[in-house]
Amino acid sequence: MNWILDTPLFVRLAGLFLLGIWLGGFLNLGIYRLAYQQRSISPWSAALPGARPRRITDRLPLVGWFGLRRESALHGAGFWVRPLALELLTGALIAALYWWEVGERGLLPDQLRQFLDLPGNLGLALAALATIHIEFCAHACLLAFMIVASFIDLDEKTIPDGVTIPGTLIGLLLAAAAPQSLVPVAEFARGPNGLGLASPRLSFLTFVDRADWNWGSELSLVLGIGCLWLWCVGLMTRVWRLRRGWRTAMRLFCARLMRDPMTKWLVILGVLGTLALVFVHHHLGGAHWQGLLTALVGMAIGGGLTWVVRIVATAILGREAMGFGDVTLMAMIGAFLGWQPCLVIFFLAPFGAVAIGIAQGITHRDPEIRYGPFLCLAALVTIVRWAEIWEKTAPLFALGWLIPATLAICLLLMGPLLIIVRGISNRLRGE
């Protein structure tokens, strides 16, 4: 860690910018290879029949795309502009994220930053910087997955499991191995007689942070296993048709579930995951279990809340309100950040989506909104402004069991609001 801190900040930023550009090349590969309609645009893919073989120089970040312009007849004029811009964007985002999280310590409250800058607090400052670097690595990893998911969603209106399943598993693994990868929480304890401030405690956000919930050790294990299996079952292929009655619907549902080869792998994943949870709970415990449990609950609430909204909105609007990829995307984000940030993200994302939806309704364009990019943008805003967001929302998360009750009321109110939105949309389209 010392050699990193001894390196000037601008050198670190320049190195991360170049690393981000290189990473952007592989994100381009993921965008074109993981999509439903795969395309051989990335220089790391095989060239299409009739195209000249790919050269080594074609795989150089940025400059390689100028050589690949020769394939414009196959992929369309200017096809190379977006992947080149994405490499630049990835480099800029990685460097900017490091500057904000590490250079400016932007995820920490001002009071803590001032405390760490006081003479005699060098040890605490170095420990905080080590934690911040772990957080940055986790957030950079999440950013990479969100970029791939967003661009595939923009292209195809879908988010493949090939992006969100590995992303979710990596988020869970990071939370268990390095709980500091979760968003930070700083608390100040009062000194003797309530005067002055003792040394601050910099920790990570936990499942029960600020909430008065008493979860015993064994009950927390049951909760974690339940969250894992909810995710696994949610990923299974489900076909439910009631046209021929409940019995036929159930028979077809089970038959399709058993025929799908993905079901077997998800069951295996659930069993192995359960064994892993038991190991972490009984043998590692402490912060490792708290971190993993926080990620599991974040995964379940992030994905589960989106799933419920999808079901309700689809029933009211009479068409699919959002794809199931949005559900798995929010589960992945929850695994990296926890459930409290997921609620913030869930309420931030619609603002941009509603504005775009109204504009599309007025211009009679495609009424379907790619919601995934808005979820990712809201997640990025939540990460960057976390210190301010937590300062303002922490008292709300201390309400304990009033939180799920409030969410239930919001879901009940969503029905009438969606009916109003459907009426406005139909009127704008002249229906």
Model-derived regions, located:
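A membrane-topology feature that recognizes alpha-helical transmembrane segments
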Residues: 1-431
